[in-house]
A protein has these predicted regions:
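Helix-turn-helix
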Residues: 1-31, 35
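Alpha-helical DNA-contacting segments of helix-turn-helix folds
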Residues: 33-43, 106
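Hydrophobic alpha-helical connector segments
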Residues: 35, 49-81
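N-terminal hydrophobic signal/anchor transmembrane helix of membrane proteins
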Residues: 43-46, 69-81, 136-139, 163-181
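Secondary-structure edge/capping motif, primarily at the C-terminal ends of alpha-helices
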Residues: 48-59, 84-94, 121, 148-152
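Short secondary-structure transition hinges
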Residues: 58-68, 81-110
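An amphipathic alpha-helix signature
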Residues: 66, 70, 74, 108-115, ...
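Hydrophobic/aromatic-rich alpha-helical bundle segments in the mid-to-C-terminal region
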Residues: 100, 118-167, 178-183
Length: 183
């Protein structure tokens, strides 16, 4: 079923609710999708923050950095896959203008948090450059998630490996010759 066919009546039918009960909390299908989108983004964000706090941004080699990034990318993919309607929620957040702010706010929240941690590790780096880099790479990782979930014929392991390699190679510029590779 496509997003266009989603209706509050269909939601009521599937959820076992009456329309008045649903309308008490949600005035329309966009409000429902907004809440579902927030829940999905919050779950993904929590996973990324936990990964960062567990040392996800710190590695002693490029291979370790790629492996750590692959771990969080696979986790985010699985969170989306496990949420009922997760792929459809992602599609709606990209396609429906009134839902795009939820996705963008999530991206920027993750990017800010990541940038703060990277600036602690690379204090000589430009705040603006690090923040731009984290926004770009967060968006890239989100696009890779969408690609593998929306296109079942895509080789998920290969797409995940390659996006993680791209991100790690990009971030190695901030290491400035150090032996540590972050993000």
């Amino acid at each position: 079923m496509g997003f266009e066919r989603l209706s509050t009546n269909l939601v009521c039918q599937r959820a076992g609710l009456t329309p008045p009960a649903l309308y008490r909390y949600f005035p329309n299908k966009y409000a429902i999708l907004s809440e579902l989108g927030r829940r999905l983004m919050d779950a993904q964000d929590r996973a990324v923050f936990d990964w960062i706090e567990a040392g996800g941004l710190v590695a002693d080699s490029m291979d370790e950095a790629i492996a750590k990034n692959r771990e969080i990318q696979e986790t985010v993919n699985q969170i989306t896959r496990d949420m009922p309607g997760g792929v459809w929620i992602l599609r709606a957040m990209r396609a429906v203008p009134m839902l795009q702010d939820i996705r963008i706010a999530s991206r920027d929240k993750v990017a800010r948090h990541t940038a703060e941690r990277l600036l602690e590790q690379y204090p000589a780096s430009s705040t603006e450059e690090i923040y731009a880099a984290t926004r770009i790479t967060t968006e890239l990782m989100m696009a890779a998630t969408e690609m593998v979930l929306e296109q079942p014929d895509a080789d998920e392991a290969l797409v995940t490996q390659e996006v993680c390699r791209m991100v790690c190679l990009y971030y190695s510029q901030f290491a400035g010759g150090k032996t540590r590779y972050n993000l």
